[in-house]
């Protein structure tokens, strides 16, 4: 018997709830806790929708506050040097995406010629990866607590490297083993 799953679910919310929460946060009119509450509500709504429509394996780690590739960059600890000095993880995450007064944002480009844009990883030959899977684990536990059968979505290492920018011109695929 075949099983069903989807690769990912639109995350913005049918009334653009995530967009409005993020804009309020960036404008200083909402706390990050409020953004996280909106995000959790949306994840739960989207998971329940899939369950109600008889999807066998509910995707988790497909929700992002900004970009799934940016989440993968953070998960791998592939932080460009200009952002390393930002201690607050939330501030660093959004500075990488949007830039700040001292730093240019990371480049964005089209995801496989679609209208979706992703943050381009900046890779160099001597990069050391420091994996942090806490976001993935937290969302998996969150889905299991709702009685769901979640499957974890990941951008694979070859896709990550193939879509990266080798800032020093190095062979980025030489880093494949270090990601694993």
Q: Predicted segments — roles?
A:
Residues 1-180:
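Domain-level signal for soluble alpha/beta catalytic cores
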